[in-house]
Amino acid sequence: MPCQAPHSDSNVKNPSEATNQKDHSPRVGFVSLGCPKALVDSEQIITQLRAEGYAISGTYDGADLVVVNTCGFIDEAVQESLDAIGEALTENGKVIVTGCLGAKKDAAGHDIVSSVHPKVLAVTGPHALGEVMQAVHTHLPKPHDPFTDLVPAAGIKLTPKHYAYLKISEGCNHRCSFCIIPSMRGDLVSRPVAEVMLEAENLFKAGVKELLVISQDTSAYGVDVKYRTGFWNGRPLKTRMTELVAALGELAAQYGAWVRLHYVYPYPHVDEIIPLMNNGHVLPYLDVPLQHAHPDVLKRMKRPANAEKTMDRIRAWREICPELTIRSTFIAGFPGETEAEFQTLLDFIAEAELDRVGCFAYSPVEGATANDLPGALPDEVREERRARFMEVAEAVSARRLQRKVGQTLRVLVDEVNQDGGIGRSSADAPEIDGLVYIAPPQRTSQRYRAGEFVDVRITGADGHDLWGEV
């Protein structure tokens, strides 16, 4: 998902105003594309730029150079990133490229970005703060005596002030046949647990009301360091998902905030966090990428291949935590997928009654081993299966949302306008899930603002969103 291009620092309401305050400061424009993990990389780069005294420009022509943080996972993302680089070159002329596309090579082994746009100043891969800053220093020397203490402890965020992403690790140890992330971001590297907790505390102190825990594989947190014991506030704390989630939940409770978990690979120890969700330590929301339900397709994907066990676990999770929302993603039309295998997936979706699902028609990704599998399906078959999948999934979602009519839900308000408010319940992550549309307040005592929690009585529902009143 692209941010405004170039992106202006979210702590500065008027980019031109920030520029006028320090006309002598070198100015950097910023374009951020891709997933929440890439957004965190962008936040780290912008934080470092500000710490070193650079101003962040809100326009191309107001910038001395532009940094483009790219996505390279699927073909559409590659093209979007290449187009953004081209636009920045046309509008500004001085461009540094970072992110996943920067790590991709073409069939001949040449850097894709430099091949298409040879005029870029520098190209780095993802999670490359040091390399990006070195390139910036080379082409736009940093100012003298920066006021580093002007940068807030929480860093600079590109999200609204009331929610933020907390990245706990980088890279992935899995080798799913459809994915090239390990080749771009490397194997799993877990952040020290005390560092993660300190960032979380700083975010809560800065007013964040919802913390979204992200990584390529949240469940694997700490595997690379053998679950080493760290220390937080003088107490031992294991570098392990369960212990981290419990500690984050306790910390969030002190600030009346939410913690939401994303990218939770279905390892057995995921079962340990369901009681924490039921006890209110973290939101009863589990983003677990299942990808398919037929064992043969899962084997070709190099994913866990026991759908019956997955169904049993889902039942057990809901028995422990009845309010649990389960989100997942799936791929339709994977190479070799038969009609019978696809029907198994549809049957699974109907039986599992997952609350939130996304489905992609399989798209070959350059460098993925799945490209070598036999049985590639025509585009029209892949798209037709994706549409059939979503028809079933949306019917399930509509039924589950209808059950919420008449209930009172805790809602975090994202936006207030003349038509009322727009917010999200515990079942809704920003950008990817549904919304709760809140009627305008009838009394002064019912007024609400963005970033506040309100209790909303649900009066209506469709297949994706809810409507209600305070």
UniProtKB/Swiss-Prot annotation:
It comes from the Bacteria. CDD domains: Radical_SAM. Catalyzes the methylthiolation of an aspartic acid residue of ribosomal protein uS12. One of its GO terms (biological process) is tRNA modification. This is Ribosomal protein uS12 methylthiotransferase RimO. Residues 1-27 are annotated as: Disordered. It catalyses: L-aspartate(89)-[ribosomal protein uS12]-hydrogen + (sulfur carrier)-SH + AH2 + 2 S-adenosyl-L-methionine = 3-methylsulfanyl-L-aspartate(89)-[ribosomal protein uS12]-hydrogen + (sulfur carrier)-H + 5'-deoxyadenosine + L-methionine + A + S-adenosyl-L-homocysteine + 2 H(+). Keywords: 4Fe-4S, Cytoplasm, Iron, Iron-sulfur, Metal-binding, S-adenosyl-L-methionine, Transferase. SMART domains: Elp3.
